[in-house]
Amino acid sequence: MAKLSTDELLDAFKEMTLLELSEFVKQFEETFDVTAAAPVAVAAAGPAAGGGAAEAAEEQSEFDVILEGAGEKKIGVIKVVREIVSGLGLKEAKDLVDSAPKPLLEKVNKEAAEDAKAKLEAAGASVTVK
């Protein structure tokens, strides 16, 4: 088989759909026993390990909203969960609230995270934003 240059490989990737690229990455990971996400996790852990935790917190742009507990007003919390998490039915929202602590929103901006936290706390839930 002829060796392809980097430019030729990039041109081939540009022709592929996202689904095809996703399948390619999965096969690549299995074939070479690697994960594409490993360098990102190491890079993210670097600043925190270096003692710059305050700087890392200021630069954070994605937040997770975690439901810690429903409190005494479970029905109100279920209603708010359905409002915040799109596409949830009543049963799914109830199961989510019953199985707390659970993440409700992941990788959202600060405004959305604070808004969700305020609504959930107003309904009686205990919530953390990370």
UniProtKB/Swiss-Prot annotation:
<dbReference type="InterPro" id="IPR013823">
    <property type="entry name" value="Ribosomal_bL12_C"/>
</dbReference>
<comment type="subunit">
    <text>Homodimer. Part of the ribosomal stalk of the 50S ribosomal subunit. Forms a multimeric L10(L12)X complex, where L10 forms an elongated spine to which 2 to 4 L12 dimers bind in a sequential fashion. Binds GTP-bound translation factors.</text>
</comment>
<dbReference type="GO" id="GO:0003729">
    <property type="term" value="F:mRNA binding"/>
</dbReference>
<dbReference type="Pfam" id="PF00542">
    <property type="entry name" value="Ribosomal_L12"/>
</dbReference>
<dbReference type="GO" id="GO:0006412">
    <property type="term" value="P:translation"/>
</dbReference>
<dbReference type="InterPro" id="IPR000206">
    <property type="entry name" value="Ribosomal_bL12"/>
</dbReference>
<comment type="function">
    <text>Forms part of the ribosomal stalk which helps the ribosome interact with GTP-bound translation factors. Is thus essential for accurate translation.</text>
</comment>
<dbReference type="GO" id="GO:0003735">
    <property type="term" value="F:structural constituent of ribosome"/>
</dbReference>
<dbReference type="InterPro" id="IPR014719">
    <property type="entry name" value="Ribosomal_bL12_C/ClpS-like"/>
</dbReference>
<dbReference type="InterPro" id="IPR036235">
    <property type="entry name" value="Ribosomal_bL12_oligo_N_sf"/>
</dbReference>
<dbReference type="GO" id="GO:0022625">
    <property type="term" value="C:cytosolic large ribosomal subunit"/>
</dbReference>
<dbReference type="Pfam" id="PF16320">
    <property type="entry name" value="Ribosomal_L12_N"/>
</dbReference>
<keyword id="KW-0689">Ribosomal protein</keyword>
<protein>
    <recommendedName>
        <fullName>Large ribosomal subunit protein bL12</fullName>
    </recommendedName>
</protein>
<keyword id="KW-0687">Ribonucleoprotein</keyword>
<dbReference type="InterPro" id="IPR008932">
    <property type="entry name" value="Ribosomal_bL12_oligo"/>
</dbReference>
<comment type="similarity">
    <text>Belongs to the bacterial ribosomal protein bL12 family.</text>
</comment>
